[in-house]
């Protein structure tokens, strides 16, 4: 394998630890592609529930934008978060972060304060992975609908 077997050894150690550990524990793990995980990791008793976290809805996108604006010392109240959230459907949280970073850079190049127009322009320039890989996202959503608990 590309990692020299590190992943296999790591999963083996995790499975052994989960099997041997007798105290009550609450273990949370995340995966971008659950189909790539070994099936023995997914059986009941190891992970009793699998939750599906979809891309952020409008309210979540507004919240994510607010977080990333604040992190960059911007007052989110200066922006029309409703309008901005309408322009970035199917964006992931990390894609929204990059929109804010790129828009701030573009505004700096113009020697103007960051404004909605900069953010919207960056959103229009961004092709989110969910659009570029729409078939894969559709399949993942279908798989999750049949097998997972919605995290919403």
Where do the model's predicted regions map?
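C-terminal engagement/docking regions of AAA+ P-loop ATPases
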Residues: 77-100, 109-152
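Walker A/P-loop NTP-binding motif of AAA+ ATPase domains
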Residues: 1-85, 91
